[in-house]
């Protein structure tokens, strides 16, 4: 496997961060964990589990979860590498809030995975390839395009309708009726 990297004079490696157009210096440990995520991506394809995506979650410089895309293996369109790693890390650490952890992804996360990263409160994301690399080999970006308002939501015949009347009222009451019983964090 040939690595693509840009090395600075101080030995750091530059990769894209989660913010478009922003470059961040990545130190040796970051490179090590990002390399592990890339290895997971290869592993997932080699064993037929799913697409070429890998993710590693780290706590105090120790790997908590190292996963790859499992969409085909589990017949689950949500079993992306990042989501699978978050699920595994939450189970291992016995909590749903991963604010002391970092995630390394082989590719820029899709909107669903960004959502999972946000909801799990991961403190840092380092990714290698831009989404365009995945798009170039046939993975689509229609959800991101739809969210940005730059594309037409053609790939789905999904009808979206907000309920009204009694259906909406009873659904909204769930939150009022359970606010004292349920605390997320």
From Swiss-Prot:
Query: Any idea which GO molecular function terms this record carries?
Result: guanosine deaminase activity; zinc ion binding
Q: Where in the cell is it found?
A: Cytoplasm; Nucleus
* Gene Ontology cellular-component terms listed: cytoplasm; nucleus
Q: Where does the chain bind Zn(2+)? A: 80, 110, 113
**Reaction it catalyzes:** guanosine + H2O + H(+) = xanthosine + NH4(+)
Q: Which residues form the signal peptide?
A: none
Q: Which PANTHER family does the entry mention?
A: CMP_DCMP-TYPE DEAMINASE DOMAIN-CONTAINING PROTEIN, CYTOSINE DEAMINASE FAMILY MEMBER
**What is this protein's record name?**
Guanosine deaminase
Organism, by scientific name, is Arabidopsis thaliana
Q: What is the lineage of its organism?
A: Eukaryota, Viridiplantae, Streptophyta, Embryophyta, Tracheophyta
The gene it comes from is GSDA
